[in-house]
Design a protein with these regions (language model features):
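A bilobed periplasmic-binding-protein/Venus flytrap-type ligand-binding module shared by bacterial periplasmic
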Residues: 130-139, 252-268
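Short beta-strand->loop
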Residues: 116-126, 234-250, 258
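A conserved helix-loop-strand patch within extracytoplasmic ligand-binding domains
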Residues: 107-180
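Ligand-binding pocket segment of bilobal, Venus flytrap-like solute-binding proteins
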Residues: 182-247
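Second-shell loop/turn segments in exported
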Residues: 37-41, 85-86, 92, 120, ...
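Alpha-to-beta junction loops
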Residues: 89-95, 153-155, 216-225
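Solvent-exposed loop/turn segments at secondary-structure junctions
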Residues: 46-49, 79-82, 100-104, 138-141, ...
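Early extracytoplasmic/lumenal segment of secretory-pathway proteins
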Residues: 7-11, 19-109, 119-120, 226
């Protein structure tokens, strides 16, 4: 769950994005006389609940403004995997991915036009999050900061950076702590981060799968997680889990884009 002060910004940004796609589709793929259109939003793992909420707001907004119904299909998974799926043919009208680099992959295969990052406010990053630790109630391992994740015997759960955008932010947050602790000594930073990943018990393909491993399968002592994912878990299981905010984290900036080539192929 994102901070309340962020909600209006998120809503406006998503409305702008979906509105843009809706305008393009209005008189093309759905036909002038049809009363329903379809938008496919390919997103990263832990955004299901966010977009379920805002899809409903957008549907009501679009119906009131244009008198047409809109069906928004959601697709979720690890951010890198989702980008590759679009490249391989997944029919995405909109991508809302965890990393700008994942979206940029679509430009390399000409699915996005150059300059896409400047098409929407905030360099096409409508909201931010950060990285936190989710631990079991009472914090039995007394985990307070990144150095605790490197201690012998601590079992860490984090997704795979090869497929998960959130996992990349996790890595960068750990690296940032290493910079704070070891300054410019890159070898010490590398060894520190390596020691954390040496404690990883399970490395799932995406952030939601990692949460499932920690929460439902009861594996690990600490989950490195998106703040919104951790907050949602504590809200659902207040007697089982708690959040630890490390001394150093990172400003994670997910990125959105309209997939130009797919929109044009649909006659827009």
């Amino acid at each position: 769950m994102l901070k309340k002060l962020k909600v209006p910004v998120i809503f406006v940004a998503i409305i702008i994005l979906l509105y843009f796609v809706g305008i393009m589709r209005q008189n093309s793929k759905i036909g002038k006389n049809k009363q329903k259109m379809e938008i496919v939003n390919v997103s990263y793992d832990p955004t299901r609940e966010l977009y379920e909420r805002y899809n409903g707001l957008f549907k009501a907004y679009y119906k009131e403004k244009y008198g047409k119904d809109v069906n928004i299909i959601q697709s979720h998974g690890g951010s890198g995997s989702q980008a590759r799926s679009v490249i391989e043919g997944l029919d995405a009208d909109v991508v809302t991915l965890a990393l700008e680099n994942d979206v940029a992959l679509l430009e390399k295969v000409d699915l996005l036009e150059k300059g896409w990052v400047d098409k929407f406010p905030g360099s096409s990053s409508p909201y931010t999050s950060t990285i936190v630790f989710l631990v079991r109630k009472g914090n039995p391992q007394n985990i307070k900061d990144w150095n605790d994740l490197a201690k012998k015997g601590v079992k860490v759960i984090t997704p795979d950076p090869k497929s998960s955008g959130g996992a990349c932010w996790n890595f960068l947050a750990a690296w940032s702590y290493g910079i704070e602790k070891y300054g410019k000594d890159e070898n010490k930073i590398k060894n520190f981060v390596k020691s954390i990943y040496g404690n990883v018990a399970v490395m799932d393909s995406g952030a939601r799968a990692a949460t499932t491993t920690f929460v439902e399968n009861n594996q690990g002592d600490v989950l490195i997680a998106w703040e919104n994912e951790a907050i949602a878990t504590v809200k659902e299981y207040p007697d089982k889990y708690q959040i630890v905010y490390p001394s150093v984290s990172i400003l994670a900036q997910p990125t959105v884009a309209v997939v130009d080539k797919i929109a044009k192929n649909d006659g827009t």
